[in-house]
Amino acid sequence: MALWFVLLWVSSLQYAEVEAFFDWLKKADPAPTPPPAESIVPILLHGEAPAFEMSVVDEKFLAEAKQMELSPLDSCHFRVVAQLKATCSGLSEEQLAKLGVALFNCQSEVEGRRTYPCTEEMSIKECTADMDSDTWNAYHIVSNRARSVCYATRQQHFRKRAELTVNALISTATSQLDAMKDLKEGQKELRDMTAASLDKLLEGHGALQIQQGALKEGQEQLDASISENLQRLAQEKALISTGQQLVAQLIQGITQRMENVSGQLKDQTAEVQEGHQAILEDLAVVRGSAQDIYEKMELNLNGFLQQQNTTAHFYTELMRKLELMNGTLGYMLTYLDNMQTRLEDRLHMIQGYLGWAGLSLRALWTCVMHAGYFLLCAVLLSFLQCTTFSRVTLLLSVPINAIAEINQQAALDLISLTLLLFTLSLGRWFVLQLLWALSKIKGRTCSRPPHLSIYPPKEKTPEKQHEFGEKCPASSSTPVQSDPVCDLEVESFMMGDPCVLGVSPSRCPPKFSHHHLGGTPNHSTPRLKSRHSIAATELDNIPQRNLGVFLETVNRSRSSSPNQSLASSSSFSGRSLCSGITRLGQPCKKRAVVGQDYCRVHEGGHTSYSRL
């Protein structure tokens, strides 16, 4: 190992010369000229080898060039090539031309002729501006050989430096051989001394190993005895601590249990006392409640019996009314069957007439639809009391549309026809409004056009107001807008009042109003809705309608219906409802005894309601 360290140290000392030897591969700068051959011998004799460096500095290159035996032309060539910034192969055309000028100047300077200065800042034109034709031709000859001269100069320079380097390398190798011989002898002496030292070291290590073995055995025995003693001591301490903990836990558990038992006994005693007291209080309350309930049951026993009797009587009356309703419904079913048979016969008859007349089903359907539409619109216009224009429009448009559709001409459907009628009425109203506004603007006195309202305006004279006070009672709940008589007539007609539907006013029975009893219904079964009566003078103005057998049959069925019987029993009789109060606090719905205000249950003014 020591030999290798010495070799590395010697190599590090010679690193500078080796690096200088390989510097020519970098191609960074032109190499300086090698020193003359006369100067190499004294350098080799003294053992000093110059470093191989390539510098572009002119002074160093010239100092080396002076040491070599060169002609003035070669020296000039070396100086010119040393000033180049690039390699010979990397020169541009302009740089090559300037190199030719510099080489031509060297030739002229050696021959004593005129030179032409040319620097880096000057262009090639400025460098060759003063040349005549002969000089120009000579310059071209030199310029064509400029790259070759550059290569030759560089090779010559490298050859001189290589010779110098090889000579220095030989001198260094000789000195290294002498140093290696001395190092070899020192290594031999070192090896002998190292072997003797190793022998002595091995003997000492053997004796020391024997002593360490004896000490190890004694130490192991001592460790084993100490470990065994410590284990026994730890076990004894653990047993002692475990016993103490168990004893402490037992004592603590016994103490806690005693405290818990004492507290539980106290709590249970208090709870038992409180429960006993609460039970006594509850028993007292239950006893009082039972006494109150018993007293109330004694008081309400008669009321329950009376209510049971009332319920039985009501049930009997209900069954009787249900029997009447059942008979009425049977009669209605029989009548409907007869009516269906008649309608089928009439339809067969109409069908036969149509087949005999040769009419088509489509034309018949068109006529039926337009007739129904005409009747519906006529009723609606009459109900709304529209103007004559709307009625005339309906009277003209519906037949014309039906005739056009039967003749397969352009016709409107019912929806379009409705929109047409509505548009015409609305357009007329807008025109009247516009005319009224124009007349008002011009200052004319013109009556306002009629509004599209349901009820037409009427003048209210004192005579009519007096008649209205006589005809319409104050207890009417129907809102009056324009004409109360018309409202009553419309309501009576819509509700099916027999005074309007009948053939003559003499068939209308007189109507009596009920006494108001708290605003609640006073009968257990539904009754006819109370309506305003119409005077005989108003009935005279109603046109008589003979509906034939159908109206008579309806009147007969209505007279035999349970509603008519209820209405006759509730509205046409002079008996009022009972003024008593039932057990539930509701007014009694039974009829009062003749000449009294109470029924048989509440006779004497007593109520069946007893407060608890």
From Swiss-Prot:
**GO CC annotations, alphabetized:** nuclear membrane
Membrane disposition? Multi-pass membrane protein
Other remarks on this protein: Has a similar domain organization and 27% homology to yeast kar5.
The root-end lineage is: Eukaryota, Metazoa, Chordata, Craniata, Vertebrata
Q: What happens when the gene is disrupted?
A: Embryos arrest development shortly after the midblastula transition. During cleavage (2-, 64-, and 1,000-cell-stage embryos) all blastomeres of mutant embryos contain morphologically abnormal nuclei that appeared fragmented in formation of multiple micronuclei.
Where does the secretion signal sit in this chain? 1-20
What are the GO BP annotations of this UniProt entry?
karyomere membrane fusion; pronuclear fusion
- Ranges annotated as spanning the membrane: 364-384, 417-437
Describe its function. Answer: Required for nuclear membrane fusion during karyogamy.
Note whether Nucleus occurs among the keywords.
yes
Compositionally biased residues, Basic and acidic residues: 457-470
Compartments, record wording: Nucleus membrane
Q: Which UniProt keywords apply?
A: Karyogamy, Membrane, Nucleus, Signal, Transmembrane, Transmembrane helix
Name it.
Protein brambleberry
Alphabetized InterPro entries for the sequence: GEX1/Brambleberry
Query: What gene is it encoded by?
Result: bmb
